């Protein structure tokens, strides 16, 4: 087997001054062909999931933590020969307490983009809680993916994903109905509860992102209007009620296809930050916008790229 190396660049910030930043490269050695990494920071520690494939194209989802300046022994969470393995739509995970929830994709039919989201819930020790269970229970042979997961402070997880169940139907003009984005909660026993559609028309293949503020879960994604404006939108749950989605900023980017470029959101108490790619007015840019009000509104975006950007 060929040996591949994944290099992880970690920013280590020392407390002496805010300017003392050292970038340290940490090598990660693992046999097989490895790809689709998902690196997560939780309570001061790092964890990583990735897909390995063997010479027969069997895929496995692996999990590892970085503790005490070294990687723990890898755990294989799931194995299959019927997976959808893709550079843009990849597995993700989150840690809540002593549990880790991971996602991966399985083909549901012969179509190129007919696949379902499967989940695996276990303790960090490796003890299985619920294995290989499906997230989207609609039963339609359509695209389901682009998953984001975050821990719920009350134990369990919040999860969001793109759901293509409606794309099998057609509009009056003959075009297929658009992709949707959905949300659910996963309990610490692996039950799927409080599932809801957040938006009935979103970009088909742009990554989603989710965070948890003191008010509740907040989701950002690339919207899709009837006029093919594909700007970044945000919606949040306050007092267990999801608010109407609003734009993070009105870029006005019109594009007649999916750019495969989703946003990223992070939060700290009432502060929320969203970054995203846009080509507003024909000028590629990576923007960053901040909210001091739990994501209810955002300030003007800050362009953070000096040169031309592609995503």
Which residues make up each language-model segment?
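Extracellular, repeat-based ectodomains that mediate carbohydrate processing or recognition
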Residues: 16-311
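Sec-dependent N-terminal signal peptides
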Residues: 4-13
């Amino acid at each position: 087997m060929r040996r591949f190396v994944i290099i992880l660049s970690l920013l280590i910030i020392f407390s002496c001054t805010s300017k003392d930043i050292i970038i340290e490269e940490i090598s990660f050695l693992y046999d097989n062909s490895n790809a689709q990494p998902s690196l997560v920071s939780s309570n001061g520690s790092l964890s990583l999931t990735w897909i390995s494939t063997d010479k027969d194209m069997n895929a496995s989802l692996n999990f590892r933590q970085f503790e005490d300046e070294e990687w723990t022994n890898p755990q294989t969470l799931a194995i299959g020969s019927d997976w959808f393995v893709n550079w843009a739509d990849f597995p993700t995970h989150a840690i809540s307490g002593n549990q880790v929830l991971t996602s991966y994709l399985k083909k549901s039919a012969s179509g190129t983009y007919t696949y379902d989201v499967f989940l695996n819930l276990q303790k960090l020790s490796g003890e299985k809680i619920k294995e290989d269970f499906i997230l989207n229970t609609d039963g339609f042979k359509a695209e389901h993916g682009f998953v984001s997961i975050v821990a719920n402070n009350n134990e369990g997880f919040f999860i969001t994903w793109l759901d293509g169940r409606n794309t099998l139907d057609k509009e009056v003009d003959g075009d297929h109905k658009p992709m949707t984005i959905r949300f659910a909660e996963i309990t610490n026993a692996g039950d799927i509860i409080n599932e809801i559609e957040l938006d009935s028309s979103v970009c088909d293949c742009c990554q989603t992102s989710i965070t948890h503020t003191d008010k509740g879960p907040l989701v950002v994604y690339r919207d899709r209007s009837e006029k093919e404006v594909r700007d970044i939108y945000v919606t949040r749950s306050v007092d267990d009620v999801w608010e109407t989605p609003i734009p993070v900023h009105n870029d006005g980017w019109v594009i007649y296809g999916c750019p495969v470029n989703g946003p990223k959101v992070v939060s700290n108490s009432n502060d929320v930050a969203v970054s995203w790619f846009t080509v507003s007015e024909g000028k590629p840019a990576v923007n960053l916008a901040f909210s001091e009000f739990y994501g209810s509104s955002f300030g003007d975006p800050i362009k953070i790229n000096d040169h031309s950007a592609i995503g």
